[in-house]
UniProtKB/Swiss-Prot annotation:
The keyword Endoplasmic reticulum does not apply. One of its GO terms (cellular component) is extracellular region. The modification 4-hydroxyproline is found at P3. This is [Thr6]-bradykinin. Its main location: secreted. It is found in: Secreted. It comes from the Eukaryota. Transmembrane segments: none annotated. Thr6-bradykinin: Induces relaxation of rat smooth muscle from tail artery and contraction of that from ileum, urinary bladder and uterus. Binds to both bradykinin receptor B1 (BDKRB1) and B2 (BDKRB2). Belongs to the bradykinin-related peptide family.
C-alpha cells in the first residue's frame, strides 16, 4: 500500500 492509503475514506 502507498503511504496515505485509506480504504475507509
Amino acid at each position: 500500500r502507498p503511504p496515505g492509503f485509506t480504504p475507509f475514506r
